[in-house]
């Protein structure tokens, strides 16, 4: 696996988090609302930033869609906002980091490590498949929902 670690400080629901990945398949488990999807979205944004025309802050804004497209909206509001927020994604031979604060507008984060990130991950392909899309392809799931055998929120529809 090209990605080896993600470190988050004051980002969305996280005060401080460091996750090291094992080679092969990694599985994120946890209750609803603990940030599993946020981790996957940040990893996806970092992987997409290996393209020279795509920046880490831009792709992060595009996958989270914060109010007014402001990256600063992703700073954890319960944390000490004077420190701002940071994300670092690492691979075997490179890392890329992004720092921003509540005052950061649009995509104006400080990014370090972009050049080495692009060079090392240039042949990487990544895809993000939302859980809803996986569920919608499950055989006979729509019938089970319609009959009330399985209950999903209103975001699930076919």
Task: For the regions a language model picked out, list residue spans one by one.
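Phosphate-coordinating catalytic segments in nucleotide- and nucleic-acid-processing enzymes
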Residues: 7, 49-158
């Amino acid at each position: 696996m090209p990605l080896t670690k993600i470190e988050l400080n004051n980002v969305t629901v996280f005060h401080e988090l460091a996750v090291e990945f094992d080679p092969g398949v990694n599985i994120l488990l946890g209750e609803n609302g603990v940030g599993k999807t946020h981790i996957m979205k940040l990893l996806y944004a970092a992987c997409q930033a290996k393209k020279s025309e795509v920046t880490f802050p831009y792709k992060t804004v595009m996958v989270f869609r914060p109010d007014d497209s402001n990256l600063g909206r992703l700073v954890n509001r319960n944390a000490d906002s004077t420190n701002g927020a940071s994300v670092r994604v690492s691979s075997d031979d490179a890392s890329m980091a992004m720092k921003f604060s509540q005052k950061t507008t649009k995509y104006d984060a400080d990014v370090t490590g972009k050049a080495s990130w692009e060079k090392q991950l240039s042949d990487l392909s990544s895809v993000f498949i939302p859980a809803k899309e996986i569920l919608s392809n499950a055989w006979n799931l729509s019938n089970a929902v319609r009959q009330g055998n399985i209950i999903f929120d209103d975001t699930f529809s076919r």
